[in-house]
C-alpha cells in the first residue's frame, strides 16, 4: 500500500467559503475596517514622502516675515545662510580603538 493512498485529501466542498451568515454585523464591521485599513495603507505607501516631509520640515519654518523691512529680511537670510555654510564645513573625526 502506498503512502499517497493513506493521506487525506480535502474534498472540494471543504475549500468553499461557508459564509452563509455574512449579514452578521460583526462580519460587516470587520470587512469595512479591513477595507479602510487597506486603503489607508496604500495611500501611506504612495504618499509617505510628502506626508512625512511635511511633518518633518513643514512645522520647522522660520519666524514670520510680515511687517519686517526688506533690509532686515535680507540680513536674516544672510545670517541663516552663513550658519548653514559653517555647518557644512564642520566635520567630526571619530577614532575607533
From Swiss-Prot:
Pfam family, one: Flu_M2
Statement: the UniProt record of this protein carries the keyword Disulfide bond: yes
Keywords: Disulfide bond, Host cell membrane, Host membrane, Host-virus interaction, Hydrogen ion transport, Inhibition of host autophagy by virus, Ion channel, Ion transport, Lipoprotein, Membrane, Palmitate, Phosphoprotein, Signal-anchor, Transmembrane, Transmembrane helix, Transport, Viral ion channel, Virion
GO biological processes: protein complex oligomerization; symbiont genome entry into host cell via pore formation in plasma membrane; symbiont-mediated suppression of host autophagy
Record function comment: Forms a proton-selective ion channel that is necessary for the efficient release of the viral genome during virus entry. After attaching to the cell surface, the virion enters the cell by endocytosis. Acidification of the endosome triggers M2 ion channel activity.
Assembly information from the UniProt record: Homotetramer; composed of two disulfide-linked dimers held together by non-covalent interactions. May interact with matrix protein 1.
Protein name: Matrix protein 2
Source organism: Influenza A virus (strain A/Gull/Maryland/704/1977 H13N6)
